[in-house]
Amino acid sequence: MFYPVIKKALFQLDPERAHELTFQQLRRITNTPFEFLVRQSVPTKPVTCMGLSFKNPLGLAAGLDKDGECIDALGAMGFGFIEVGTVTPRPQSGNDKPRLFRVVEAEGLINRMGFNNKGVDSLVENVKKTRFGGVLGINIGKNKDTPVEQGKDDYLICMDKVYAHAGYIAINISSPNTPGLRSLQYGEALDDLLLAIKNKQAELKERHQKYVPVAVKIAPDLSEEELIQIADSLVRHNIDGVIATNTTLDRKLIQGLNHCGQTGGLSGRPLQTSSTEIIRRLSQELAGRLPIIGVGGIDSLVAAREKMAAGASLVQIYSGFIFHGPRLIKDIVTHI
């Protein structure tokens, strides 16, 4: 109800400053009786995916709550699941500012944040305090200064630390803002990483006596051949799910608009069609062998339904949430 007024004020500010101010307020009310200020009631729409029970199929995508500081306040808005992160083994400040830009006319965002986060240990401490009743995903990545050849070690360190606290673990190999990261999506590098992750998952299952599914997050900027190879690798290594997609480097839909020349990943409405097409092609290739979590430009109920019609079992929002607020959650969950 109040979001249009709040949004108008926030959109006068630098995007990252607006984010910081919003999270400052959410941190203040999280785990307090004042959570009622953001709480909204949504119907239960149970979904089973990756062996987990979701109270509804709508989640918050990774990147908004990188350090898991506002899980309960965000959960109160009605998300069926929340994905925190991307988190890395060691804290890192990310890329130089400014690094987040609004493409207002297109309801898009461009970011080159660079995995800024307080490190996996800090995230785990925050996760331990949460009372969120939905599924919690933890998205993990590699530190910028870790050579790509040793990148898998960073994922294994993070897995070791988050496993006991995660509903599922998301492997981010598709951010365009960490040099060389996307190369892990291809060929031997991908097979090597997935083998190491599955071995670690088996080891941690024995140690903790519980199975935590692993999903891999992929880019939208993939050729037909690359997509076929990725699908084949995911199936061969028995990965539990795939998150499609991350942000795009493509700018054709925002040519001539403010900030269109900024480097970084583009999200929001300009990503909607291409991410849905990747989901459709991926769904055909996977033929039901593993589930797809659809994300990219969902800004309405219709956009969410399109992702599910293309083959997604669950969907996530981020940019659409920034532009439309908590009402978008209620609209999607109520009518999906």
UniProtKB/Swiss-Prot annotation:
Subcellular location field: Cell membrane
Catalytic residues identified in the record: 175 (nucleophile)
Main location: membrane
GO molecular function: dihydroorotate dehydrogenase (quinone) activity
Pfam families in the cross-refs: DHO_dh (PF01180)
Keywords per UniProt: Cell membrane, Flavoprotein, FMN, Membrane, Oxidoreductase, Pyrimidine biosynthesis
CC cofactor note: Binds 1 FMN per subunit.
Catalytic activity: (S)-dihydroorotate + a quinone = orotate + a quinol
HAMAP family in the cross-refs: DHO_dh_type2 (MF_00225)
Described purpose of this protein according to its UniProt entry: Catalyzes the conversion of dihydroorotate to orotate with quinone as electron acceptor.
Family: Belongs to the dihydroorotate dehydrogenase family. Type 2 subfamily.
Descriptive protein name: Dihydroorotate dehydrogenase (quinone)
Organism: Pectobacterium carotovorum subsp. carotovorum (strain PC1)
